[in-house]
Amino acid sequence: MQQEDDLRGLAKVMEFMRAISIVFVVIHVYWFCYRAFVDAGINIGVVDKILLNFQRTAGLFSNLLVTKVFAVIFLALSCLGTKGVKNQKMTWRKIYTAFLSGLVLFFMNWWMFDLPFSPTVDAAIYTVTLTAGYILLLMSGVWISRMLKHNLMEDVFNTANESFMQETHLMENEYSVNLPTKFVYQGKEWDGWINVVNVFRASIVLGTPGSGKSYAVVNNYIKQMISKGFALYLYDYKFDDLSVIAYNELLKNIDKYRVRPEFYVINFDDPRRSHRCNPINPKFMADISDAYESAYTILLNLNKTWIQKQGDFFVESPIILLAAIIWYLRIYKDGKYCTFPHAIEFLNKPYADIFTILTSYPSLENYLSPFMDAWQGGAQDQLQGQIASAKIPLSRMISPQLYWVMTGDDFTLDLNNPEHPKILCVGNNPDRQNIYSAALGLYNSRIVKLVNKKGQLKSSIIIDELPTIYFRGIDNLIATARSNKVAVCLGFQEFSQLTRDYGEKEAKVIQNTVGNIFSGQVVGETAKSLSERFGKILQQRQSISINRQDTSTSINTQLDSLIPASKIANLSQGTFVGSVADNFGEEIDQKIFHARIIVDNEKVAAETKAYKKIPVINEFKDADGNDIMQQQIERNYSRIKADVLQIIEDEMQRIKTDPDLQHLIPKEDSDRKEE
């Protein structure tokens, strides 16, 4: 009740001030348009005396502006205490227009007294403009009281609530990757840093095509790893985009290594610019489990649907058969013919010869018992189906160029050997991805096993477009390689792509064991998963209730997503969200970031222009300078076929002449021999 009385009292005071303001306007018109009033026969003597006294004592009418200023002051005071009904459609532009128009009409009309009309007409025009100006000023004042003081629609995307302070200090160590950034907090742009101080806890770089993941992140990983003396394995899906960067960075940073590293390339498309390497080098195959790993990797890369069916009979059978052949080539003549092309050619020989030879070795006899049971039991259809499951996919890899690259020994795959460090770039081709990925997957699986050892040089494995290749053991490498100083960086587009090509279980392990994550624009479940990973932040919520008498504002706080999935789905190119892992003694308070990674485009363009091409490794020229590449590759292809034929001939002869092994020869062959 008391409040209502106070409000009524305030309203009366405001009305009184407005009345005073109007009085000033009226006496202003009466004084300065006095001649027009006299001509009209209007003459108020008492008022004249009062106004003359004001003029003598205060000089109230000595200038046109004095009474006008007083009128405006009292008008403003009356408007300050007025509470109008709030209107959401009211805008400052509308208020400013009325206010400025009112000022012009109210104060800038003195010249109307000099118009070439009669005093009465001049006074009428002056009064009309003065009144119009006053009304506009009054309207602007009333409209101000109707304006909402809090416009809740100023930040429609909730950007201010979802901005947060990020790391602004550079934290470097001998292994770190550091990326400069810019981010917005409290309406101001800040310079920041993404400090990956523990690269050995693995990194994932996500983003749809064109989001900038290679340009902003992967390229920087390559440059900074080489500048800090890491051995490097680089899977270059679109060869030679990344390999050229690695080669030129090595040329610039050769002095950062204690032992000068060698640069090697595996490139099936261009044998001139490719080294040769045997991924199943017998030196690094200790037992038959190594052969199984190689067979497993190659066949799952050729048949990615098998990844979801691991353990099935028609998946395991061809893997075991190929593993037996690889191990046989390893133990035959101490691995002289232990190459993958020899294994493919051996597999494509008659299965009667294959099983006769393989089962003549005690170490393989039990390994192949399921096949022998089917053979001896007359289940020829089943046996042929098992063999065809291996033959058909592997036949896609029969290529002279691929045979050439995979049968040489230019280098070994122990990349982080402190005495012989290496930087290896392997190139794929999107047009031949299904074939090359299988061969490259074999290199990958051997490298994972060889680099993950103690006492080796710090090393980095960078895989761009991970789902294009089945990298067996990558989940285990992420989980165990930290103590062996192996830094893993995986680039791909989204989690669902990884799940499709690696299976749900393995994909989940990769997602959940990685310590550092970068994400450009991603959508769907990937964006939701990342949003949950980044957690929630305390955000302010404000609401306004409007009625005729009053406006009430309520403010509350609640936990909400720090970086919502919708924000992640609409990130600009080069803008990334993510989190980093820290170390003991190198703690990072704010591990999460949402920032634009700064790349000096002009500097990068200048560097790229100055880059040297990867040199030709093998000229394939004879003494006269003629190009003999095709002939040399074909000779190698023919030699492998001849080697396998000779192996089978020698082995069958050995078995036939050994009384303890003669029983292995198929009955049909024995009958032919007797004839």
Set out the residue ranges of the language-model regions.
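Conserved ATP-driven motor cores of ASCE-family P-loop NTPases powering translocation/secretion/packaging/pilus
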Residues: 478-480, 484-487, 491-581
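Basic- and hydrophobic-enriched, low-structure N-terminal and domain-boundary segments
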Residues: 1-211, 215, 220, 228, ...
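Ordered hydrophobic segments in well-structured contexts
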Residues: 176-178, 425, 575-579, 592-594
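Low-complexity, polar-biased intrinsically disordered regions enriched in Pro/Ser/Thr/Gly
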Residues: 183-189, 303-313, 541-558, 587
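P-loop NTPase motor domains
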Residues: 28, 39-43, 149, 153, ...
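Short, surface-exposed recognition loops or helix-turn segments adjacent to catalytic cores
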Residues: 55-58, 339-343, 407, 545-549
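N-terminal short leaders/motifs
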Residues: 169-189, 368-381, 516, 522-523
